[in-house]
Amino acid sequence: MSVPQQPLILQRGLEAYETTFAAMRAFTDARTAATADELWIVEHPPVFTLGLAADPSHVLDPHQIPVVETDRGGEVTYHGPGQVVIYLLLDLRRHKADARLFARELVNKIEQSVIDTLAAYNLACERKPGAPGIYMSDGPAQGAKIAALGLKIRGNGCTYHGVSLNVAMDLTPFTWINPCGYEDLATIDMQSLGAQTTLAEVQNALANRLSTSLSR
């Protein structure tokens, strides 16, 4: 099987979650075997999203922030200003004829891209078995979650949804939910850890790492 081409990177800017969600599904409905893979960089206004495994009781008090049901995997999470969100619109059959065999490798590639992006800012992070996402591995914030991921993989091997990385956020809304279904799970962002950067810089860094990783 030939090496897949690098996905196209599109910057969608600040966009309501419902708009992006509808656009991802429409793109995936319309794509053909010739459609290029794409990575969408987005920043969302405040929103809580529920994955297919979500227990609505994990939204403790939404404080008038919209709560949107989605078709991604996983539990409840929060998106808001100052967070990098990258959606991966991919055809996994370009990597393996049986797309299901590539799904775990895809998650590993996403997680490693986040780990490598954070390492460039001297932030040490790690995976946790059975708990998708990226967590701080040392220091005062050890164990705090800094990135979340959730995907939809259709039966034809096409994916959407993706990964979020906290850069410079108001983290308070995370205390109004059980993030990813875990009670009292601490969350953190790069700014709180002393990283000197901008949202745009991290958006580009993570998108480029993902694009390169997915073309290997």
UniProtKB/Swiss-Prot annotation:
Main EC class of this protein?
Answer: transferase
Q: Where is this site: Lowers pKa of active site Cys?
A: 145
Record-listed substrate binding positions: 72-79, 148-150, 162-164
Residue intervals of the BPL/LPL catalytic domain: 33-216
One Pfam entry name: LplA-B_cat
Q: Please name the GO terms that the record assigns under molecular function.
A: lipoyl(octanoyl) transferase activity
Q: Where is the active site?
A: 180 (acyl-thioester intermediate)
Q: What is its EC number?
A: 2.3.1.181
Family matches, as InterPro entries? aa-tRNA-synth_II/BPL/LPL, BPL_LPL_catalytic, Octanoyltransferase, Octanoyltransferase_CS
List the catalytic activities from the record.
octanoyl-[ACP] + L-lysyl-[protein] = N(6)-octanoyl-L-lysyl-[protein] + holo-[ACP] + H(+)
State any GO CC term.
cytoplasm
Instruction: Name the UniProt key words of this record, in alphabetical order.
Output: Acyltransferase, Cytoplasm, Transferase
Pathway annotation: Protein modification; protein lipoylation via endogenous pathway; protein N(6)-(lipoyl)lysine from octanoyl-[acyl-carrier-protein]: step 1/2
Where does it reside? Cytoplasm
Output one GO BP term: protein modification process
Any other noteworthy remark?
Answer: In the reaction, the free carboxyl group of octanoic acid is attached via an amide linkage to the epsilon-amino group of a specific lysine residue of lipoyl domains of lipoate-dependent enzymes.
Purpose of the protein: Catalyzes the transfer of endogenously produced octanoic acid from octanoyl-acyl-carrier-protein onto the lipoyl domains of lipoate-dependent enzymes. Lipoyl-ACP can also act as a substrate although octanoyl-ACP is likely to be the physiological substrate.
Q: Per the similarity annotation, which family is this?
A: Belongs to the LipB family.
Q: Which NCBIfam families match?
A: lipB, PRK14342.1, PRK14343.1
- Supply the name of the protein: Octanoyltransferase
Please name the source species: Janthinobacterium sp. (strain Marseille)
The gene behind this protein is: lipB
